[in-house]
Structure formats: C-alpha cells, structure tokens
Design a protein with these regions (language model features):
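Glycine-rich phosphate-binding loops of nucleotide-dependent enzymes
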Residues: 1-234
Length: 235
C-alpha cells in the first residue's frame, strides 16, 4: 500500500481499527455488529464500559446514551433489546456506538441498503443533525439520488481507481453515472409488454414465525407464470 492520510492537517498512520477510533474516526458497517439479546446500552458500551468501584456504571452509561440519542433526535430506547427493535433503529444504535466513543468523522457503508423509504428519510435527517453539530460524514453508496440529496461533494471510484471529485451542486445524476461506469447511461428502459404463459408456481397465504415466535411472513401470496419475471420488494 502507499499514500498518506491526514487528519486535522496532520499525517496519521493506523495499524488497527482501534487506532482510527482513538483518533476520532468511526465506521458504521452495512452488516450490523450487535448482540441481539443485549440491550441498546449494553451494545453501545461493550468494550468501553464505565466502571464505578468494582462494577459497571450502567446508570452513567445509560444517561450518556440517552443524551446522545436526544441530541441528534434518534429516538432510541436505551433499555430496549436489539432483537425487539427495527433494522432502522439497529442502525441508529451502530451510529450511537461510534458517537459514544467520541467519533468526529463517521464512515457510513451502504447505510440505506436494508432500510424502508421512511427509515431512509429518518437517516438523512440524522445525518443533517450530525453535520450541523460539526461532525464529518463519508457516505459510501451506489444510489445516486442519495448523493445528490445529501452530499456536498462526491468522489467517484471505478474498479478501485480514483476518477474524480465534484461538487454535487454542479452535476446531475447522469454526470455521476457516466463517471462511475465510464460511459453515458440511459436511465430510461424501453421494455415491450409481453404475455406470460400459464402459472407454474402458486404460493398462497404463507405465514411464518422466527425463533422468538414473531411473525415474519403474514399472508404471502405469489403467482409466477411461464416466461415471467416476478420481483420481491421489501426489507
């Protein structure tokens, strides 16, 4: 490897993720690293537990988690178990984890991949709250609408190579797409309507529960015809 990293005008070197965390850089991964039976607070303080005497100071930890949640309008219950909250709320717990450790630079890796449209809107509001408080955000995404809606600058990487950095206000989605793939992109798809054949798969009123007994499929119905493509949308 080669190159250099400067943080607040000073060149720095990281030998481990802990080095980056200690210098104020935190990462929220696409796949969360949370312990499902633990509470929100327990997950956030894991590894950096405040100690009072010979025991973990849960009261102080909970108060700090609640303060951070309220400051950035995350609306998180510090006592809730991870297994009982939504994917969007779990992501907020991951954000709180890095904030609890003092991060000023947050790297969000494909943060909207598993979110509903409403959760995406909530995440964008949280990002705006963070930047208004002086935090810096690196948003890694393939979704151009999110770049144009939330970012000030955009750096494009294609097959691991740096292509360029642009001010988002000066470009549109077509410009960004062309930089990403190296050619003009047509977002309009002309597809002829075709008649599908007979039903080859018919699924009716499927219900299923997870290991906790919580219903995860409720009345699922799918019919697939010969020569037909059926898409499933959801999180």
């Amino acid at each position: 490897t080669s190159g250099k990293i400067e943080l607040n005008g000073k060149e720095v070197t990281f030998h481990s993720p802990k080095d980056a965390i200690d210098m104020g850089i935190g990462m929220v991964h696409q796949h969360f690293m949370l312990i499902q039976p633990f509470t929100v607070t327990d997950n956030i303080i894991l590894g950096v537990e405040p100690v009072k005497g010979l025991t973990v100071d849960k009261k102080t930890a909970r108060e700090k988690v609640l303060e951070l949640s309220e400051r950035y309008n995350m609306k998180i219950d510090p006592d809730a178990k991870i297994e009982d909250i939504s994917v969007g709320m779990q992501q907020r717990v991951e954000i709180l984890k890095v904030l609890y450790r003092g991060a000023d630079v947050l790297i969000l890796d494909e943060p909207t991949a598993s979110l509903t449209p409403q959760e995406i809107e909530g995440l964008m509001e949280i990002i705006q709250n963070l930047t208004a408080d002086g935090k810096s955000i690196i948003l890694i995404t393939h979704k151009l609408k999110e770049i144009t809606a939330s970012s000030d600058q955009c750096t494009i990487i294609r097959q691991g190579k740096y292509i360029g950095t642009v001010k988002v206000a000066d470009v549109n989605e077509n410009d960004l797409a062309a930089m990403m793939v190296g050619r003009d992109v047509n977002f309009k798809v002309d597809k002829k309507e075709q008649e599908a054949g007979e039903v080859v798969l018919d699924v009716k009123d499927i219900h299923a529960k997870d290991y906790r007994g919580v219903e995860i499929l409720n009345g699922l119905n799918i019919s697939v015809r010969r020569g037909e493509i059926v898409g499933l949308a959801g999180v």
